[in-house]
Regions:
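Non-cysteine beta-strand/loop elements that form the S-adenosyl-L-methionine
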Residues: 75-77, 190-192, 349-354
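Active-site beta-loop-alpha junctions enriched in small/polar residues
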Residues: 29, 79-81, 138-140, 168, ...
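Metal-dependent amide/peptide-bond hydrolase catalytic core
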Residues: 212-391
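Divalent metal-coordination and catalytic microenvironments
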Residues: 24, 63, 76, 106, ...
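A structural signal for isolated positions on well-ordered beta-strands in alpha/beta enzyme cores
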Residues: 53, 132-134, 292
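Histidine/acidic-residue-rich, glycine-tolerant segments that coordinate divalent metal ions
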Residues: 83-85, 89-101, 108, 114, ...
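Acidic/His- and Gly-rich active-site-bordering loop/insert found
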Residues: 2-102, 111-127
């Protein structure tokens, strides 16, 4: 309905979108420290005449565009934080902050949302309702809970639907991935401390070797995936860190392990937490150790509202072309705290393809998007609002 109008307006604001993306890329800030990023967003919103609110949660910014007539409220969301990664892209606008990089594309997400804001601000006479622009800190740090705290602030209580996106190197450039239901996994983290009793390595019968118990635990948890989980379900249980021992000829008194669990369903998530604890208790009895499990729940699974995905699929085919819209066959085991919004508000999360031969993965020090995808993201977000709220 608004194809020509949106396409022309996107073309008009595109140079600014590229400028925004490159600025964000040059000045990344990690979770909870997005101070200058927040101030820059505020400055750009003010320059567009878009009112905004801050101070309700860390460095979050909430912009508001009022349409010409009353109606429902739709939200668009972008995450703001970068990663503690030393950039190796060689880009002329590479990070100027040593050891910090936008290696997950959040620079693009913010630029796209500002671009959608620019388009919608210019076309607000066509809008019957309100648009909330959600600039969210701390997506990468589940302990802070950027999405969870934004929802808890109450600022989105009047929102009837919400949309967001993530650049996705596993899809080709120019393609938008739209999948109903499960899109991304729940991500939990666990910490294990195994307490034994140290002794001379030649007299291990006088002590309790925490390292041997840790080795058994590592092996035993693999059966949670291969022997205790329905093969039609998906789960990942990875132990990525183990620290144990002080010297080659001393039996190990303390062993520490850290790992992650990824699931798609609440029931399987609960089961994994319970079974990790039960395995530890059983091994304590077997080896005489004393163990502690600290299981920390992170982002929940990202589950798209099917109706909203169908809505976006129709928009994508109309605005970008039939071949530009794909439905990914499988969800990802990566996690996203857009899930926090979808637990309360109907909506959908898109994957914006940026993959071509040799494109590094997300979180890689050489990751960089193809900037030709920026207008596609702006178009999808702006069109979602206008098609839902347009007169």
């Amino acid at each position: 309905m608004y194809e020509k109008l949106i396409q022309d307006t996107v073309s008009e604001v595109l140079p600014k979108v590229v400028e925004w993306r490159r600025h964000f890329h040059m000045y990344p800030e990690v979770s909870g420290k997005e101070v200058e990023t927040s101030l820059y967003i505020q400055k750009e919103l003010a320059a567009m005449g878009i009112p905004f609110e801050t101070g309700f949660f860390q460095n979050a910014v909430l912009g508001v565009i009022e349409g010409a007539k009353p109606g429902k409220t739709i939200a668009l969301r972008a995450d703001m934080d970068a990663l503690p990664v030393t950039e190796q892209t060689g880009l002329p606008f590479a990070s100027k902050h040593e050891g910090v990089m936008h290696a997950c594309g959040h620079d693009s997400h913010m630029a796209i949302l500002l671009g959608a804001a620019a388009v919608l601000s210019k076309l607000k006479d066509h809008i019957a309702g309100q648009v909330k622009l959600v600039f969210q800190p701390a997506e990468e740090e589940a302990a802070i809970g950027g999405g969870r705290n934004f929802v808890a602030s109450g600022k989105l209580d009047d929102v009837s639907e919400i949309y967001g996106l993530h650049v996705w190197p596993e899809l080709p450039v120019g393609v938008v991935g739209l999948r109903p239901g499960n899109l991304m996994a729940a991500s939990d983290r666990f910490y294990v401390h195994i307490k034994g009793k140290s002794t001379h390595a030649a007299q291990l019968h006088n002590g309790t070797d925490a390292l041997v118990m840790a080795a058994h635990f590592i092996i035993d948890v693999q059966t949670l995936v291969s022997r205790e989980t329905d093969p039609m379900e998906n789960v990942v249980c990875t132990i990525g860190l183990m620290k144990a021992g002080t010297r080659y000829n001393v039996g190990v008194e303390d062993a520490y392990l850290e790992g992650t669990v990824r699931t798609y369903t609440p029931a399987l998530r609960d089961k994994m937490e319970r079974r990790l604890g039960e395995i530890l208790k059983g091994l304590d009895v077997m080896f005489g150790t004393k163990s502690e499990l600290n299981y920390v729940r992170g982002h929940s699974a990202t589950i798209n509202t099917p109706e909203k995905i169908r809505f976006l699929q129709k928009i994508g085919k109309s605005y970008l072309g039939e071949d530009a819209v794909v439905e990914p066959q499988f969800p990802s085991m990566c996690a996203e705290d857009f899930s926090s919004y979808l637990q309360k508000i109907p909506g959908a999360f898109m994957w914006l393809g940026t993959g071509k031969e040799g494109t590094p993965a997300l979180h890689n020090a050489s990751f960089a998007i193809d900037e030709s995808i920026l207008p596609l993201g702006v178009t999808m977000e702006a069109a979602a609002v206008l098609e839902a709220l347009g007169e």
